[in-house]
Amino acid sequence: MVPQELIEKIKLISPGTELRKALDDIINANFGALIFLVDDPKKYEDIIQGGFWLDTDFSAEKLYELSKMDGAIVLSEDITKIYYANVHLVPDPTIPTGETGTRHRTAERLAKQTGKVVIAVSRRRNIISLYYKNYKYVVNQVDFLISKVTQAISTLEKYKDNFNKLLSELEVLELENRVTLADVVRTLAKGFELLRIVEEIRPYIVELGEEGRLARMQLRELTEDVDDLLVLLVMDYSSEEVDEEAAQDIMQDFVKKRDPSPISISRALGYDVQQVAQLDDVLVSARGYRLLKTVARIPLSIGYNVVRMFKTLDQISKASVEDLKKVEGIGEKRARAISESISSLKHRKTSE
């Protein structure tokens, strides 16, 4: 999974940016380049040697012309200025590097030493490599990226359909108060898998830049409510009450893990289970956070008060409008919204 801080740097060289235009022109001309992005060039006077000082406004055309010289180029971090051209960059030679070519060895060492972005363009292989801190990212061809993203979105659509199906089945079981831990874990696992795919393809979409607008729209549409639903499920089914922030942490931990086991998800929810077979034997009751927020449209801040009074969704569903009005923040309108939304959901699920 590509870290968010690296994704932010990949945006600098995405198609549609002036910097990417220059890099593509450099590759097409069969040139090489070494580009160092800095906040203040004076900080790096011991590293930047020779060359000449420009301090001129950045443009793709200027960068392309300057790349015809052998030396490196120093730009401002916001890609608005060209500070130096034709310089010799001298990072600490004792910093370990796994690269072989001189340009790429310098780039890796420089990024590790300064924590800044360094871009190397290989003349021989026509490849753009971005180095940042201890990270390296090799820029992909647009055709490859589009193919990769298209496949991933197709997979996401199937996962979202399955996730929605599991949620629908869970709703039926919730209304009948016969949910097992296995049902909850199965639904959470599918949601975690869905978000993991999103995290894996996000760098590709960022790298596509303007070419990825449609993919970004599709991704947003497919996943806009998944995070919230998973957080609410964790809040509903944790063995001990957890707030939204704690539930968010649990969700994020599992999105980062590859193929989390049903046992690990169960234990994160606070259940002491040793074998997967046990999950079918553990009956659990929803607190009602998800239904209150997504079906009855009750704000989570008020939902806390409802759950605090009634404890479970089963008890909420049995409460009268008058009972519900006793909750702080619940008036006639919200009480009826809760009561009627649960009744409507029961009727809809019964008729399906």
Curated annotation (Swiss-Prot):
Cofactor needs: Mg(2+)
From which source organism is this entry?
A: Thermotoga petrophila (strain ATCC BAA-488 / DSM 13995 / JCM 10881 / RKU-1)
Which reaction is recorded as catalysed by this protein?
A: 2 ATP = 3',3'-c-di-AMP + 2 diphosphate
Enzyme Commission number(s): 2.7.7.85
Annotated DAC domain ranges read: 3-143
**UniProt: ATP binding residues:** 71, 89, 102-106
Name of the coding gene: disA
Q: How does it assemble?
A: Homooctamer.
Q: State what protein this is by name.
A: DNA integrity scanning protein DisA
Keywords (A to Z) from UniProt:
ATP-binding, DNA damage, DNA repair, DNA-binding, Magnesium, Nucleotide-binding, Nucleotidyltransferase, Transferase
Q: Which PROSITE patterns match?
A: DAC
